[in-house]
Amino acid sequence: MNTSSPTRSPQSSPSPNPQSTLSHRPSPRQPQSSDTPPNSSANAPIPDDEHGADLPMNMTASVMLTNLPRDAHQALADVESIDSGKVTVRFQPLPSAPILKNRVFKVSASQKFETVVKFLRKKLDCKDTDSVFCYVNSVFAPGLDEGMGGLWRCFKTDDQLIVAYSMTPAFG
């Protein structure tokens, strides 16, 4: 006999009686005998709460604020002011890329990186079939839907966003 395993007494073991076991299937209905009253506690429905049930509310029915707290209002104002100005972009050619006469341009911070790529393609007189590969700080190629304000805030060098460009893939 293993002493580490608990011994089971008949009272603690599950009952083999199918009427008392729990199952995910409902037990078949048995005809009601004539000696049990129709409103016995076994057949009675579950009563509703006396205080009434709370109905679930969606977000549109939740509490509406008439004005924002002071710190939230200031945070929103700060975010709006970030993308309202212009950012400086410096184009840096990689080897074998054509060189621009003017390398520094200003672009609205609310513009997407796609706008910068289109502008660069126009300045380089690229055909529709030509490829232009752009890299921020010669490290990564941002997505075309990235905001210029966010890129400038995170990756600026001397208050300029350095965009290296090449006609062939330069990095990985």
Curated annotation (Swiss-Prot):
Biased composition (Low complexity): 1-21
Keyword flag ATP-binding: no
Topology with respect to the bilayer: Peripheral membrane protein
GO molecular function, one term: Atg8-family ligase activity
Entry keyword annotation includes Lyase: no
Oligomer status and interactors: Forms a conjugate with atg5.
Entry protein name: Ubiquitin-like protein ATG12
